[in-house]
């Protein structure tokens, strides 16, 4: 609720946060250069088991401009790929995550609503890399036999 009621403040906070992040990425690039392939830029979860935490319109209004500015700087000034962490049912906002310039989404919580790995690959596989997750971490992994886990992982690898 506060996020929606105080959007100007949210933009001010994110603007400053991204200013600091870019300064830090400048230092990191100078220190490690292309010895790093991928950088983790944001750990904000945008999903629960059943839904995303905001609409695509809200994501585009509040987060996308700031993430895009940071990711554009990284892509224009380094060789790095950028990954975004978000658990949950994020299918409705995945187009915004892609538009913000993220190269990779991690993890892929296939137990969350509409996060079917085949569907994700078919619809977005040429636009973003799905890294990590991708296996059933709530039923198969904790409760499956070693054989069931092995079969499940191999099946997911075929996607």
Question: What spans do the regions from the language model cover?
Answer:
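Active-site loop segments of alpha/beta catalytic cores
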Residues: 1-159
């Amino acid at each position: 609720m506060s996020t929606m009621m105080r959007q100007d403040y949210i933009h001010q906070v994110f603007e400053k946060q991204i200013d600091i992040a870019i300064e830090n990425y400048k230092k990191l690039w100078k220190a490690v250069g292309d010895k790093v392939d991928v950088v983790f830029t944001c750990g904000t979860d945008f999903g629960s088991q059943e839904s995303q935490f905001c609409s695509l319109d809200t994501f585009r209004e509040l987060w996308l401009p700031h993430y895009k500015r940071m990711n554009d700087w990284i892509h224009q000034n380094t060789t790095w790929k950028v990954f975004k962490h978000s658990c949950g049912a994020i299918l409705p906002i995945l187009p915004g995550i892609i538009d913000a310039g993220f190269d990779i989404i991690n993890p892929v919580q296939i137990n969350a609503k509409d996060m079917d790995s085949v569907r994700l690959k078919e619809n977005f596989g040429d636009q973003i890399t799905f890294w990590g997750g991708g296996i059933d971490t709530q039923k198969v992994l904790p409760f499956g036999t070693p054989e069931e886990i092995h079969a499940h992982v191999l099946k997911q690898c075929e996607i």
